[in-house]
Design a protein with these regions (language model features):
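Short, low-complexity, charge-dense intrinsically disordered segments
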Residues: 1-31
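Mid-chain, well-packed structural core segment of small domains
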Residues: 92-130
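Acidic, low-complexity mobile loops and tails
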Residues: 32-91, 121, 125-158
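Short, intrinsically disordered low-complexity segments
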Residues: 16-17, 27, 40, 65, ...
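Contiguous hydrophobic segments
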Residues: 13, 116, 155-158
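Intrinsic disorder/low-complexity signal
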Residues: 2, 9-10, 23, 37, ...
Length: 158
């Protein structure tokens, strides 16, 4: 195999090759670490959105929080404001950088996750659960369908 000498057990046992193969291990590691929930939609700017009727919950993806590092502060000053899709609705501050947060769809932001005021690390620990950022009333639920599904977002993040 490619000029590398392997033990007879490895050569003759396909199951063993799958377990030991570094590329296979990387794929298993990546799929375990970087899984994207199928029930959410995603943006190329690394936000996720979950829709329940006309109310959407929005946060940043696992990929985004890993790239940012330890999150120390979230600022959203757009509560009660109507914003268009793509508008900046706040910022997230990590130890190494500050990043804008972009609204995936048009609507009015109703609520900021109150737990983030004292525990912004929830975004790092549970980005798709307790680490949600805002809830909003969307103008059109059809806009959500135009966003990326999990497979599309995974293709963006490589």
């Amino acid at each position: 195999m490619n000029g590398i000498k392997f033990s007879a057990n490895y050569e003759n046992n396909p199951a063993m090759r799958r377990v030991v193969n570094p590329f296979y291990s990387y794929l298993r590691y990546k799929s375990f670490i970087m899984s994207y929930p199928e029930n959410l939609r995603y943006t190329k700017d690394h936000e996720w959105i979950s829709l329940d009727g006309a109310i959407a919950t929005i946060g940043i993806t696992d990929f985004a929080q890993r790239e940012l590092g330890d999150i120390v502060y979230v600022e959203v000053e757009t509560i009660g404001k109507h914003l268009e899709a793509g508008a900046v609705f706040g910022t997230v501050e990590a130890v190494k950088t500050v990043s804008d947060l972009f609204l995936p769809v048009s609507g009015t932001i109703n609520e900021l996750n109150p737990a983030l005021a004292n525990s912004p690390e929830l975004i790092n620990n549970d980005p798709y659960g307790a680490g949600w950022m805002v809830k909003m009333k969307v103008d059109s639920s059809a806009d959500v369908d135009d966003l990326l599904d999990a497979a599309g977002y995974e293709a963006v993040t490589g």
